[in-house]
Regions:
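C-terminal "cap" of GNAT-fold acetyltransferases
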Residues: 87-89, 127, 134-137, 146-147, ...
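Conserved acyl-donor/pantetheine-binding loop and adjacent beta-alpha core of acyl/acetyltransferases
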Residues: 69-97, 102-105, 158-163
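Conserved GNAT acetyl-CoA-binding A-motif
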Residues: 114, 121-132
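Conserved GNAT-fold acetyl-CoA-binding loop/helix
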Residues: 3, 24-45
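Conserved acetyl-CoA-binding loop-helix of GNAT-fold acetyltransferases
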Residues: 100, 106-119, 142, 146
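A short helix-loop-beta-strand connector motif used in the catalytic cores of GNAT acetyltransferases and
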Residues: 44-57, 73-77, 94
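Conserved beta-hairpin
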Residues: 54-68
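A short beta-loop-alpha structural element at the N-terminal edge
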Residues: 3-17
Length: 175
């Protein structure tokens, strides 16, 4: 049975393992995401999110299989995006750093996490959903498109110290 909950301190080792697994997959040519093992996402990414209370984990049969950050923090790169919908900051919920353990892929966990994110946004009275991915991450782009997210812009940037990122900004309006 799938359960999504706020992460706890005791979850950090498993979250770090999932981050390492996705980095291994990319380094072995099994995925194209655009992240960097030494820069992002790393354990400190999860620790900072845990401290803000916006780190969420997905469990299946009590085993953590995916992790994401959900909050109202719009990264600075969003200021350069041509968003289609106007929204006040407190009306926007942002989905960051979704990672499904590569050993658990193709089970619908990504879709289920996005569904949770949308419900979470509604519960917090947010009408605008925003997220991003790297232009090279075709798997994520396809999934988000299939879930009704519109790519509104591609912003070139240095993201979290990773150079030459083409930042795809996506949005979906709930109202």
């Amino acid at each position: 049975m799938i359960n999504i909950r706020s992460a706890k301190q005791m979850d950090l080792d498993r979250v770090e393992m999932i981050y390492n697994n996705i980095h291994d997959e990319e380094e072995n040519g099994m995925a194209t995401i655009g992240w960097n093992r030494d820069i992002y996402p790393v354990r400190k990414t999860a620790e900072a999110a845990l401290e803000r209370n916006d780190l969420f984990v997905m469990e299946d049969e009590k085993r953590i299989v995916a992790v994401a950050i959900i909050n109202q923090i719009q990264v600075p790169e969003y200021a350069d995006a041509a968003w289609k919908h106007e929204a006040k900051e407190d009306e926007v919920m942002v989905f960051h750093t979704l990672v499904v353990d590569p050993f658990e892929k193709k089970k619908g966990y990504g879709n289920a996490f996005v569904s949770f994110y949308e419900e979470y946004a509604k519960q917090h009275n947010c009408k605008e959903l925003r997220m991003d991915t790297n232009v090279i991450n075709q798997r994520a782009r396809k999934m988000y498109h299939n879930l009704g997210y519109q790519e509104v812009d591609i912003v070139p940037c240095v993201f979290n110290g990773i150079p030459d990122v083409q930042f795809v900004c996506l949005e979906k309006c709930l109202s």
